[in-house]
Amino acid sequence: MKNVRYQLFKRSLAFSFEAKTSRGAIQTHDAYLIKASTPKGIIGWGEASPLKGLSIDATPQFENQLKEIISNLNQGIDARELDLSKLPSVRFSLETVHLDVANGGQMRLFNSTFLQGTPQYMNGLVWMNTPQHMLEEAILKAQAGYDCIKFKIGAHEHDEECRMLEQFRKKFNANKVQIRLDANGAFLPDEALPKLKDLHAFTIHSIEQPIAPKQMEAMQEICAKSPINIALDEELIGLNPNTDAGNLLAKTGAHFLILKPTLLGGLAAAEDWIKQTQKYNRQWWATSALESNIGLNAIAQWTATQNNPLPQGLGTGALYSNNFETPLLAEKGYLYYIATKNWTLPEEKEELIVHLS
């Protein structure tokens, strides 16, 4: 974009609880916010927040790379001329900041009924904790109106996790609450099928990434023999949807793809994956990847334009104790955009790391 000036902000987001995954505990997550300003006073925001241990751009050099990119943009270099092939979160942030500016800079990136009050169907996420705590959290979410609940599993003894799901099913049958599982690649290939057969007893909709990615033959066998539908998540990271998706979908036979724009290179890249799911008769849903409310806002507004009836994985600002206030509101299994609520955005005196020159 011509005559646009860019600034870079950083906020260390602090989890409001002990966030655990099968890859370990997370206490903070760095959010990098790009602010674009035009001579007419239009301001847009985008977010680049790669996930450590997962995103291909979550490296020690990332902040310096991002500073250099902002410097290049302020020197008049077009974003399309920059090599961002290994920086998917930056592609997402620049795509969304430019969408924001192009649409008037009101944090309204797409024109949809979502912005006019039509809510989006979403799943409730149960973070990894002790099995008892997870059970209690799932019950609370079901009582709060969520009829699709996703459990992160794989960190505890298999029998313990089965008993947790059994206890949940005693209170909420499959007609009342759909269960999704996410193993984050925690199962070993030779143990995955027996575990999936055990988990099938609890009427499971799907399980994300039962084994670690890049094990094509093992994943192919699991997809073919599993009694539970398989969803691919981490498997997509670093792949090109236009050249790699056909081989992935045809070989594995996976039923669902999980699309995370921060990890895949933005909304346009996610739409390329959607085209592949249509070609191979698969389904998908989108999931946020621990972004702040700025990144979540962009993803939620985009998913609202896709007319996907499946529950989306749109985690909300309640994850963090120092997130940005937002018009987004999660209630009774739906995500709402409350147009009368205002944003709070980064403060220059505290969080600005690249100034206008």
Each language-model region and where it sits:
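Active-site pocket-lining/capping segments in soluble small-molecule metabolic enzymes
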Residues: 110-112, 213, 287-353
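Active-site donor-binding loop signature of nucleotide-sugar glycosyltransferases
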Residues: 48, 209, 314
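Catalytic core of soluble alpha/beta enzymes
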Residues: 156-297, 301, 320-331
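N-terminal capping/lid subdomain adjacent to the active-site entrance of alpha/beta enzymes
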Residues: 1-179, 184-186, 200, 325-357
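A short pocket-lining beta-strand/turn micro-motif at the edge of beta-sheets
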Residues: 70, 77-80, 255, 280-286, ...
